[in-house]
């Protein structure tokens, strides 16, 4: 089977170049600093709205109608919500699996971030540092 897929970047892992409106009114350059520059209420509201509107069931239907058979979903290390101040997103991933099943699409889950960042870019969760491999707690 050939995989013909679409990347759903910017949905569950924020990347400022894709989702700049989420960062408006802050100096944050990445997902690490965004919740630290907003009130908890403002952060939760932005994330909740973004996750419910950025990718929807309609997108999965459209992806299938265009002849694709797979989606790639980047997820953060805090997907289960156990790493304050971040908000987990396992419910959204569960929805994605239901939609994919409904439209006959496969899913490739991409663990896209790790604590301390694996690459030092915004798509690693925090810009300017790359300390994941240097902290035994992060690697264990």
Predicted regions and their residues:
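N-terminal carbohydrate-binding accessory modules
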Residues: 1-68
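Substrate-binding cleft and catalytic face of glycoside hydrolase catalytic domains
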Residues: 58-140
């Amino acid at each position: 089977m050939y995989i013909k897929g679409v990347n759903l970047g910017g949905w569950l892992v924020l990347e400022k170049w894709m989702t700049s409106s989420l960062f408006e009114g802050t100096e944050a350059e990445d997902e690490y600093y965004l919740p630290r520059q907003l009130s908890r209420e403002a952060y939760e509201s932005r994330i909740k709205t973004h996750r419910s509107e950025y990718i929807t069931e309609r997108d999965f239907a459209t992806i299938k109608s265009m002849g694709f058979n797979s989606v790639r979903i980047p997820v953060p290390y805090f997907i289960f919500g156990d790493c304050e101040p971040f908000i987990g997103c396992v419910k959204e991933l569960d929805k994605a699996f239901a939609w994919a099943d409904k439209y006959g699409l496969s899913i490739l889950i991409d663990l896209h971030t790790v604590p301390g960042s694996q690459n030092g870019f915004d798509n690693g969760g925090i810009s300017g540092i790359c300390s994941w491999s240097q902290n035994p707690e992060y690697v264990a």
